[in-house]
């Protein structure tokens, strides 16, 4: 598919269109097209932003099909949104008690959200559920979501946690981290270690290579101490290696690069999927801050307020907080 022109996704007055799409493979596929076409991406739903949903996915009233992006790219112009706008889902039958039932997709979304926010306030409290209600995770109130999780879904969550392996063998992510931290890794022409299973004969990403790499496709909330609701799709301990393989394979194919380059790009961007995608596309971060280096990480480890203040000035407070969490993961 041809890359879109720079001004496809802009309004008549020249301002960029803003889009929101739930984290996942669709976002990975469409984000480079939207960004290259001049659009902006929202990490959470914002007033006035175009909410994109995949065909067949439950959609709120007014949401726009992801086919819109593809159609604009193919036609090389901005098309009317109304041609791709959903009128809203048909109402579901209520339960005998008069409540709207939870769907399997909503149950899965609740479980995933709790897994991704393992460091957030307790599930028995209210803060987590009010946050999820604000993000529009499901059609239900925060009270209904909390009740659904505590009464029906928590046993499934505990069972899933018990079946996770305590430790994973070293994979490509750890190998890239070792390369990233090496004092000799400043050159992009350094030899790839012989033991790294970079690609199989088909040129694809072997699943075994992702055994040490796990990723969360949903946005992970920043620590409550930050006092902000901004989110970022970062790599987390609760996700599966299959998702990591899909993401890395997608980047390798999208940007025609090798496995080590992709994993090092993820390291430099604190595991942020959207930031890594833009970095591989444009050679810089979308937010304008520099990428992290080994020297920056060494400075970050120092218990020195002056050093920390310099890092915040260089990377921004949010990026420093994400880097600290990423290095601990």
UniProtKB/Swiss-Prot annotation:
Region (Disordered): 179-206
Gene Ontology cellular-component annotations: chromosome, telomeric region; cytoplasm; nucleoplasm; nucleus; shelterin complex
Keywords: Activator, Chromosome, Nucleus, Telomere, Transcription, Transcription regulation
Domain (BRCT) ranges: 63-86
Chief localisation class: nucleus
InterPro entries associated with the record: Homeodomain-like_sf, Rap1_C, Rap1_C_sf, TE2IP/Rap1, TERF2IP_Myb
One MF term in the entry's GO annotations: telomeric DNA binding
Extent of motif Nuclear localization signal: 313-329
Record bears the keyword Membrane: no
Gene3D superfamilies assigned: 1.10.10.2170, Homeodomain-like
Pfam families: Myb_Rap1, Rap1_C
Keyword presence, Nucleus: yes
Domain Myb-like stretches: 94-153
Subcellular compartments: Nucleus; Chromosome, Telomere
Disulfide linkage: none
GO BP term, example: positive regulation of NF-kappaB transcription factor activity
Stored SUPFAM superfamilies: Homeodomain-like (SSF46689)
CDD domains: rap1_myb-like, rap1_RCT
Function as written in the Swiss-Prot or TrEMBL entry: Acts both as a regulator of telomere function and as a transcription regulator. Involved in the regulation of telomere length and protection as a component of the shelterin complex (telosome). Does not bind DNA directly: recruited to telomeric double-stranded 5'-TTAGGG-3' repeats via its interaction with terf2. Independently of its function in telomeres, also acts as a transcription regulator: recruited to extratelomeric 5'-TTAGGG-3' sites via its association with terf2 or other factors, and regulates gene expression.
Further remark: Shares a bidirectional promoter with KARS.
The family this protein is said to belong to: Belongs to the RAP1 family.
Subunit structure: Homodimer. Component of the shelterin complex (telosome). Interacts with terf2; the interaction is direct.
Protein name: Telomeric repeat-binding factor 2-interacting protein 1
Species name: Gallus gallus (Chicken)
């Amino acid at each position: 598919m041809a890359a879109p022109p720079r001004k496809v996704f802009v309004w008549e007055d020249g301002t960029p269109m803003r889009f929101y799409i739930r984290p996942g493979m669709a976002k990975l596929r469409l984000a480079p097209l939207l960004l290259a076409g001049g659009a902006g991406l929202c990490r959470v739903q914002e007033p006035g932003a175009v909410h994109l949903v995949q065909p067949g996915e439950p959609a709120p009233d007014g949401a726009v099909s992801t086919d819109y992006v593809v159609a604009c790219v193919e036609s090389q112009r901005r098309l009317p949104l109304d041609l791709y706008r959903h009128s809203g889902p048909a109402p579901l039958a209520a339960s005998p008690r008069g409540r709207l039932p939870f769907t399997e997709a909503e149950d899965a979304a609740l479980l995933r959200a709790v897994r991704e926010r393992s460091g957030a306030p307790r599930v028995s409290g209210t803060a987590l559920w009010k946050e999820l209600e604000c993000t529009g995770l499901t059609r239900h109130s925060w009270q209904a979501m909390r009740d659904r999780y505590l009464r029906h879904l928590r046993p499934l969550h505990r069972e899933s946690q018990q079946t996770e392996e305590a430790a994973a063998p070293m994979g490509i992510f750890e190998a890239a981290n070792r390369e990233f931290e090496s004092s000799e890794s400043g050159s992009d022409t350094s030899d790839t270690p012989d033991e790294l299973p970079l690609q199989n004969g088909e040129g694809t990403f072997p699943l075994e290579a992702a055994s040490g790499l796990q990723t969360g496709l949903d946005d992970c909330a920043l620590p409550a101490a930050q006092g902000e609701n901004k989110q970022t799709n970062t790599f987390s301990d609760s996700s599966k290696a299959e998702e990591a393989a899909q993401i890395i394979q997608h980047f390798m194919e999208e940007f025609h690069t090798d496995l080590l380059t992709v994993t090092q790009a993820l390291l430099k961007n604190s595991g942020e999927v959207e930031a890594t995608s833009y970095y591989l596309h444009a050679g810089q971060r979308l937010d304008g801050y520099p990428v992290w280096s080994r020297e920056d990480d060494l400075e970050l480890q120092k218990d020195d307020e002056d050093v920390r203040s310099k890092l915040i000035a260089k990377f921004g407070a949010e990026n420093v907080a994400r880097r600290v969490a990423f290095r601990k993961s």
